[in-house]
Amino acid sequence: MKEHLFQAVEAQRTTLTAMADSIFDDPELGFQEFHAQKKLTDYLTQSGFQVETGTGGVETAFRAEFRNGQGGPRIGLLCEYDALEDLGHACGHHMQGPAI
């Protein structure tokens, strides 16, 4: 199982790195992360997730759900993709979404 997971991540390395770099190159402050949201949600949609934007009344928030059959465990993940004013992504938030 572990090796399968590593192979799956490795197969996406170029795409995920490019996504993180794109978000890094276009830092957006909190509640203004339209570019980052689009990058992340486009990837998730293409990967078979059902994506809902504007979650919780926050225009740049989103919720993505992947269904794999009925029942079973549920896993929740959270990522931040906002930048710091005058510092950009010194916080590393540009990597959270692609890493998850």
Residue map of PLM features:
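Acidic/His- and Gly-rich active-site-bordering loop/insert found
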Residues: 2-100
